[in-house]
């Protein structure tokens, strides 16, 4: 076990990730904290398209199935206040109460009542970082930023959710959009009369238009 109980509580779901390299050489890729590197990133000079799915947080249910006690942990909401904020514990507790009110205003999280958790993890693990990136580019970049949010809740075509998370769940999970953009091992093509096919056409049109025309 490489992850500690505290890591699990902090939603660190992999022991691997970018590491600041201690020696500055020609081959060095991460000489300082990514937050600092982003302020002078060459990517700010080019147009980008960035986005995600509506229920990215479904991915985190895999962890909850293994550790359901995390949903009743007293620090569930406190642990989702960004750890890098330089604020007092009293302020953190205040923010944690606001998170509870936002995602579970009239109930408590549980395996049967996990939708609030899914939305909180979608925001905390994925959309919060996307939002900060979009705002940062708007403040310091003259290049354009195109943002997409994909919500295609299919019973049969959201392959990542069905095969990797839970076939009984609904929503558009992390990586579900790949089935609409690329062919895969299922060799499955939805019928032209379905909303899945219309979603496929729309996504391919959006991405190819960006590649060809830059908008």
Swiss-Prot record:
Q: Which is one GO molecular function term here? A: carboxylesterase activity
Catalytic residues, chain numbering: 56 (charge relay system)
Q: Does the keyword Protein biosynthesis apply?
A: no
Q: Does the keyword Glycoprotein apply?
A: yes
Q: What is its EC number?
A: 3.1.1.1
- According to the record, glycans are attached at 184
What the entry lists under Pfam families is as follows: COesterase
Q: Which UniProt keywords apply?
A: Glycoprotein, Hydrolase, Serine esterase
What is this protein's function per UniProt? Overproduction of nonspecific esterases is a common mechanism of resistance to organophosphate insecticides.
Among PANTHER family, the record links this protein to: CARBOXYLIC ESTER HYDROLASE
Q: What else is known?
A: There are two such esterases: A and B. Alleles of both A and B are known.
User: This chain belongs to which protein, by name?
Assistant: Esterase B2
Q: Which organism is it from?
A: Culex pipiens (House mosquito)
């Amino acid at each position: 076990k490489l992850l500690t109980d505290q890591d699990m509580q902090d939603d660190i779901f992999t022991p691997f990730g970018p590491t600041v390299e201690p020696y500055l050489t020609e081959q060095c890729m991460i000489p300082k904290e990514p937050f600092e590197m982003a302020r002078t990133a060459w990517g700010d000079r080019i147009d980008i398209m960035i986005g995600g799915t509506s229920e990215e947080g479904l991915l985190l249910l895999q962890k909850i199935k293994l550790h359901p006690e995390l949903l009743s942990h007293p620090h569930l909401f406190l642990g989702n206040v960004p750890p890098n904020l330089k604020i007092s514990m009293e302020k953190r507790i205040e923010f944690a109460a606001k998170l509870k009110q936002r995602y579970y205003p009239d109930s408590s999280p549980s395996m049967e009542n996990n939708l609030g958790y899914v939305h909180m993890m979608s925001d905390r693990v994925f959309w919060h970082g996307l939002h900060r990136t979009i705002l940062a580019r708007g403040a310091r970049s003259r290049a354009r930023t195109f943002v997409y949010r994909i919500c295609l809740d299919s019973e049969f075509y959201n392959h990542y959710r069905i095969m990797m998370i839970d076939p009984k769940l609904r929503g558009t999970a992390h990586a579900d959009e790949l089935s609409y953009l690329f062919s895969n091992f299922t060799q499955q093509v939805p019928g032209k009369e379905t909303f899945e096919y219309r979603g496929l056409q729309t996504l391919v049109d959006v991405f190819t238009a960006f590649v060809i025309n830059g908008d």
